[in-house]
């Protein structure tokens, strides 16, 4: 009985630390795009701009920008105001000092989209430091639409 209780406590402790980051860069990116479904539920309306989501997914230097941006003409993470995503391809481009660069490619309504996620391994797991599209970065995009 004590072993079972110890196992449950260990699992719960692991879950609480995973709530503020992710175990791998690939897991982080997969979890971002899990929010981009067919909008049939609240979990498929795009990545929410609330404080809890910001804490889980973003580096502290990007959290305020994520939660305070309003009036964006499109969702930066899918490069469109609407989405119907095909398969998401994820690969590690390079690891450089404290940052890891993750290439992401997918089709959105039949249009090819490529993004580079720059992720860092924080105290609670992997989080997004920035995201680059061929023409812009998430940090610059959010600065344009800050509330």
Question: What residue ranges belong to the model's regions?
Answer:
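Bacterial N-terminal signal peptides
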Residues: 5-14
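Boundary at the C-terminal end of the N-terminal hydrophobic targeting segment
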Residues: 18-21
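Surface-exposed, charged secondary-structure patches
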Residues: 23, 55-111
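Short, aromatic-enriched amphipathic alpha-helices that serve as compact interaction elements
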Residues: 23-41
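Surface-exposed patches in mature extracellular/periplasmic domains of secreted proteins
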Residues: 40-50
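Low-complexity, intrinsically disordered terminal/linker segments enriched in charged
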Residues: 95-99, 109-112, 130-147
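Hydrophobic/aromatic beta-strand elements that line small-molecule binding cavities or substrate pockets
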Residues: 115-120
